[in-house]
Amino acid sequence: MQHDVIIACDFKSAEDTFRFLDLFKDEERKPFLKIGMELFYAEGPAIVREIKRRGHRIFLELKLHDIPNTVKKAMAVLSRLDVDMCNVHAAGTIEMMRAAREGLTREDGTRPLLIAVTQLTSTSEERMREELLIDASINDTIVKYAQNTRAAGLDGVVCSPLEAGMVHGACGEEFLTVTPGVRFADGDVADQVRVTTPARAREIGSDLIVVGRPITAAEDPVAAYRRCVAEFVG
């Protein structure tokens, strides 16, 4: 897959979302968008259908994590929304991820890309040890989750850019690394711990970067998006 920038549309309503998207109406290539929990839970499938109608690709990030049968049935519903990519939590086990893939696969054999979350970019080793009782290093945990994801037949993982090269080393160059935790060099890291810049993210192995506030909260979102594309895609 070619390198690309995904804008995280972390808005609370359709009105806010479309006001933002209207800024890009003159862009020749419509940005790839991430729809997360807040917007999807507020607006439901209708928001997905309308954004697709406007010509955008969609990463529907709901991070499913439940028993395999429940996830399989949920994915069967999501498969009808014509999104381009969706995800689950790798911690849900190989069995759950396989069930997710089966549920997402349509009768004609096609399906959206399916990836799994390894460790959130807000996670640190200290939190893993103290709150989750995980003594393994964060790098070892991410590699193991990535290997499980590949074994389940998924297309890639969500990880920090700092671990993207490591994931490719363990799972192959064709295995997608989708990375949040990207900020401009002169920007605020906010609540994320493991972050880097767009240019550095590409250098160390990110295939797709997910960027929210540095674009959506910018004084000129279109200019910020173009800057991000220039730094990451070239």
Predicted regions and their residues:
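Glycine-rich phosphate-binding active-site loops on the catalytic face of alpha/beta enzymes
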Residues: 81-94, 181, 191-224
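Active-site-adjacent beta->alpha loops and helix N-cap segments on the catalytic face
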Residues: 14-19, 39-54, 66-76, 90-113, ...
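Hydrophobic faces of well-ordered beta-strands that scaffold small-molecule active sites
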Residues: 3-9, 33-35, 58-62, 86-88, ...
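A short, Lys/Arg-enriched amphipathic alpha-helix followed by its capping loop at the start of a domain
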Residues: 23-31
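Conserved anion-binding
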Residues: 2, 70-155, 163, 170-174, ...
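Hydrophobic secondary-structure block in the mid-to-C-terminal portion of proteins
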Residues: 153-211
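Short, acidic/polar
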Residues: 12-24, 69-77, 138-148, 192-200
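Structural motif
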Residues: 27-28, 54, 81, 152, ...
